[in-house]
Regions:
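A late-sequence structural motif
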Residues: 164-204
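Heptad-repeat coiled-coil signal-transmission/dimerization helices
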Residues: 14-18
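Pocket-flanking alpha-helical
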Residues: 40, 44-53
Length: 204
C-alpha cells in the first residue's frame, strides 16, 4: 500500500527498478495498492505500506525511507508569460493551484505556499484546487499556475522551474512499514532490502 503520490511516481519514473525487482524475485507476486488513507496492515490488506507519517501502531516495524521536500514550482510556459517571482511579495501577483479537499493531504501544511509571506493569518486565493499531487503536477505542467510540489517528483523535468528556491516548504517523511508478524518473511525482506538499496537513486 502506498499513497498515490509515491505510487504514481514509482510506476512512471521508477518502472525500470520495479522491473528489476521482478526479474530478481520472480517468485514474489506483486500487487500495488494506491491509497492515500493509511490502511490497517494488521488486517493483511497488504504486506507492507509506505506511510507519509510515522505510524503510531506498536505492532508495526517502520524505517524512514526518505524526506520529501516541498517547493513552489511553475512551468516555463507560465513563467514566460507572467514573469519569475523575485520575492515572496511577488507571489501575490501570481495564480496558484492548491491541494483540495476530499483526500488526505500528503503534507502537514498543504496551504503553506498560499500563506508564504502573508500576515495576520491571510492567504492567497487559489484559482484551482486539485485533490491529488499528480493532478497538481499536470496542472503546473499545463501552465495553469504555481503550486507546491515535492522536489523529487519534478527533479528530472525540463518544463518545470523551482520558484524562490530559498523558500523551502514543509518536509514530509515517508516511512517503510510492515507488521512485526512479517518480520522474517522472505518476500518482505527481499522488497525491503531492494528498496533501500535503491533509495539513493530515488532521491536523485
Amino acid at each position: 500500500i502506498m499513497p498515490r503520490l509515491v505510487g504514481s511516481e514509482m510506476c512512471i519514473r521508477d518502472r525500470p527498478r520495479i522491473e528489476e525487482f521482478m526479474r530478481l524475485n520472480p517468485e514474489v507476486e506483486i500487487e500495488l495498492i494506491f491509497e492515500d488513507k493509511e490502511l490497517d496492515l494488521s488486517t493483511r490488506q497488504a504486506d507492507i505500506g509506505i506511510f507519509m507519517r510515522r505510524p503510531k501502531q506498536l505492532n508495526y516495524i517502520q524505517k524512514k525511507l526518505i524526506d520529501l521536500k516541498y517547493y513552489i514550482y511553475g512551468s516555463n510556459k507560465y513563467l514566460e508569460k507572467y514573469g519569475m517571482p523575485k520575492t515572496v511579495s511577488d507571489l501575490n501577483k501570481h495564480k496558484f493551484i492548491s491541494f483540495g479537499k476530499g483526500a488526505p493531504s500528503p503534507v502537514y501544511n498543504p496551504e503553506w505556499a498560499l500563506k508564504l509571506g502573508m500576515h495576520d493569518g491571510k492567504k492567497r486565493k487559489p484559482i484551482m484546487k486539485v485533490n491529488s499531487v499528480m493532478g497538481l503536477l499536470l496542472a503546473v505542467e499545463s501552465g495553469v499556475g504555481l503550486a507546491a510540489l515535492p522536489e523529487y517528483l519534478v527533479s528530472n523535468s525540463t518544463n518545470i522551474i523551482k520558484v524562490l528556491p530559498k523558500s523551502e516548504g514543509p518536509i514530509t517523511e515517508a516511512h517503510f512499514v510492515y507488521p512485526q508478524s512479517l518480520k522474517n518473511t522472505a518476500r518482505v525482506q527481499a522488497f525491503r532490502n531492494f528498496l533501500f538499496s535503491k533509495i539513493g537513486d530515488w532521491k536523485s
